[in-house]
Amino acid sequence: MQTLLDTAHCRLTLYRYPRQSQDPLQAWDAADEYLINTLAETPLEQAGPVIIMNDGFGALAAFLHPHAPVCVSDSYISERATLANLAENELDPHAIRLQDALAPLPLAPALVVIKVSKYQALLEQQLLALRAVVTPATRVIAAGKAKDIHSSTLALFEKYLGPTRTSLAWKKARLIHCEPQAMQPELANPYPTVWPLEGTGMLIHNHANVFSRTSLDIGARFMLDNLPVHSARKVIDLGCGNGVLGLALLAKDPEVEVTFIDESHMAVASARLNVEHNLPDALPRARFMVNNCLDDVAVGAADRILCNPPFHQLQAITDHIAWQMFSDAHRVLPQGGELWIVGNRHLDYHNKLKRLFANAQVVASNSKFVILKAIKR
């Protein structure tokens, strides 16, 4: 496992989060290195706030630590990673400011550094927010995998900020340089996206970075068709996304209490919006938590846990998140408590559940998905 980022301009020890002893993935990529090298060779001259957006595990925050950056992220895990890696490198975590991707940005930043993901909706929302605060003196530089930077990506920078150009590729990464223009007319914000949930009369609200933003994903649809109701008073919707599973439970069972948990600030905000707009009378029975799986959730906090596990972290394919979700569920559930999961058939969740719970029952399956139930003995 490579943990030392050693360049001509910095030497940092960096870990992914949560730290794993045999993690084959490193906590930075070529885009981070490209940004660090470029920023080091052209020092910041303008006074004003420094904003970092979408810093995966804190490499950019550590490098720009002397400038007390404002670190903007939709990911709770990225925030925890940033703080852990600052401490690892003996850098004061209080010198930076963490804020979620829906919070207001500081005015007139001197520098904006953006890690570009392959999800353009998040980028569009962030550029729209930047449009309201940048000035012609603001330096805007972004980076990402070359394969994720398209003409449509550059068009977003042009639309919301100003003239844009790209760099040559380096280690399969590419830079974007943008020159913000003077204050321009306000543009309509297309987020959150709103669409009807078929057969319910409900309207689903999705912020920009929520999975399956414009329609119900097929895994969630399959779980909705087989949703367990009654017999559980306290339910956790783990990895809740827009909260559609917990929302359906609140609608069907007037006694159930649902806790919506996700590591995405936008997901939890979307879940809250959906309860507020569709079932306002159920709000006293709903709780909302941004968290890394079930960290610090008390034993017995739920009788049943529903889970549609992700199999990626940022842009890396990994099964450790699903494994942590299952392990945390086993810890939190009381004897007789149930974990219900939906997943792609090829992901072998059946054997993972058997290792933890010593049982796993197929509730329903189709050509692509399987719903499994495991009971805490």
Curated annotation (Swiss-Prot):
InterPro entries per record: DNA_methylase_N6_adenine_CS, rRNA_m2G-MeTrfase_RlmG, RsmC/RlmG, SAM-dependent_MTases_sf, Small_mtfrase_dom
GO molecular function list: 23S rRNA (guanine(1835)-N(2))-methyltransferase activity; nucleic acid binding
GO cellular component: cytoplasm
EC number: 2.1.1.174
Chief localization: cytoplasm
Catalytic reactions on record: guanosine(1835) in 23S rRNA + S-adenosyl-L-methionine = N(2)-methylguanosine(1835) in 23S rRNA + S-adenosyl-L-homocysteine + H(+)
UniProt keyword Transferase, yes or no: yes
Matching SUPFAM superfamilies: S-adenosyl-L-methionine-dependent methyltransferases
Gene3D superfamilies found in the cross-reference section: Vaccinia Virus protein VP39 (3.40.50.150)
Keyword Transit peptide: no
Compartment(s): Cytoplasm
Keyword terms, alphabetized: Cytoplasm, Methyltransferase, rRNA processing, S-adenosyl-L-methionine, Transferase
HAMAP family xref list: 23SrRNA_methyltr_G (MF_01859)
Function: Specifically methylates the guanine in position 1835 (m2G1835) of 23S rRNA.
Family the entry assigns: Belongs to the methyltransferase superfamily. RlmG family.
Name of the molecule in the record: Ribosomal RNA large subunit methyltransferase G
Lineage per the UniProt record: Bacteria, Pseudomonadati, Pseudomonadota, Gammaproteobacteria, Aeromonadales
Gene behind this protein: rlmG
